[in-house]
């Protein structure tokens, strides 16, 4: 019986640690995105996204499909650092869906000379080749 209890506790601890490690990786990636954005570096900001035609970004104008289309939309909407401003994410929750997918809910805020803006977002992350990537982004 002791062996069974020890085994169960070990599995619970290992599973919990794996989730925490993955959550920390996701939070770290979002922090890197903030840093890149705040330097005016959209290409490095985009490294958090899945570089694939199946990426979906949903904003006020509806869905945009594909990494390059999403990149071009960011570059068009934020042509320089005065429009980009300073980005801050406030993470509300980071929840595992399974071993390879996480669902993140948060708020975003841009402090800018041309006027502050902000809203909420939901992100679907997938572990691809050992790295967590955003495969779906719904920002409002």
Regions found by a protein language model. Give the residues of each.
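Surface-exposed, charged secondary-structure patches
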Residues: 71-114
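Short beta-strand edge/turn micro-motifs at domain boundaries
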Residues: 118-140
């Amino acid at each position: 019986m002791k062996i069974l209890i020890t085994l169960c506790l070990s599995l619970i601890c290992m599973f919990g640690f794996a989730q925490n490690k993955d959550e920390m990786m996701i939070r770290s990636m979002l922090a890197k995105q903030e840093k890149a954005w705040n330097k005016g570096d959209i290409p490095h900001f985009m490294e958090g996204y899945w570089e694939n035609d199946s990426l979906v970004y949903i904003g006020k104008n509806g869905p945009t499909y594909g990494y390059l289309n999403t990149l071009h939309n960011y570059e068009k909407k934020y042509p320089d650092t005065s429009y980009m401003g300073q980005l801050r994410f406030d993470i509300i929750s980071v929840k595992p869906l399974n071993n390879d997918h996480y669902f993140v809910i948060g708020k975003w805020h841009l402090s800018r000379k041309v006027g502050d803006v902000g809203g909420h977002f939901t992100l679907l992350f997938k572990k691809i080749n050992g790295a967590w990537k955003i495969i779906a982004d719904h920002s409002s």
